[in-house]
Amino acid sequence: MPASSHQPLDLAKFTLSSPTEIAQHLSNIAKHGHMVTVFANKGKNFILTRLLEVDYQAGVFTFDWGAEEETNTQVLNSERNVFVCSPEGVKTQFVAGQISQVMVDDRPAFQCRLPEQVIKLQRREFFRIQTPLGSPVFCRIGDFNQRSIDLALFDISLGGMSLWLPGIDTPGFDIGQQYLQCSIDLKPFGTLALGIEVRHRLTARMRNGNEAMRIGCSYLNLSAPMETIIQRYVGFLERERRAMVG
């Protein structure tokens, strides 16, 4: 296969390193009450929480106590913790160290040192939106094993898309595999004609208990007109989703 033309995301462009900027950004998250997921013990445990206070002078922040005491104990024993949230479509992620227990308004809470860096992805192309089940979209791969194959889309963004494989062991979709004769009809906005490269694989368990394989792909040879088609399609899905939730 030809060499990959995919350029890795330069996270340095989206990283806050100034203590003042970090404290301000986390304060805004706390002020608006956005939900935050904390992954502890190398992802073995997690809690859903909210940031409570950010103390720039002391260099610490506090966040809500979890609902399950056993999980809270495991979080307190974790030396490295990953915080993730998406306030107003802006994905925020940072790593913090050991967490301690404190009291806030006579209630238990967690406290941690402010992180040294915060990744703040503002570019909308890195946020994928799921395609509707009622109007499935397919990617036709014309150069698959000397024939064509249609794969259903799970989600799409300007940065890439996820596709369902027809079987858990479907061959030809290892990481790094490229296909150059692909077409995707994003009705009513237009058709994409491009290449794709498999970037990751994910095993998912369906509602019926069966396992399914999903692959994440980046685009190859994405032109400006095709970017516009994707933008319009994603915007259309976002408007429909907002209308459904009122």
Swiss-Prot record:
Domain of life: Bacteria
GO biological process: bacterial-type flagellum-dependent cell motility; regulation of bacterial-type flagellum-dependent cell motility by regulation of motor speed
Main location: other
GO molecular function: cyclic-di-GMP binding
Pfam families linked to this entry: PilZ, PilZN
Keyword list, A-Z: Bacterial flagellum, c-di-GMP, Nucleotide-binding
Domain PilZ: 122-234
Family note: Belongs to the YcgR family.
HAMAP family: YcgR (MF_01457)
Known function: Acts as a flagellar brake, regulating swimming and swarming in a bis-(3'-5') cyclic diguanylic acid (c-di-GMP)-dependent manner. Binds 1 c-di-GMP dimer per subunit. Increasing levels of c-di-GMP lead to decreased motility.
SUBUNIT field: Monomer. Interacts with the flagellar basal bodies.
Name of the protein this chain belongs to: Flagellar brake protein YcgR
Taxonomic path: Bacteria, Pseudomonadati, Pseudomonadota, Betaproteobacteria, Neisseriales
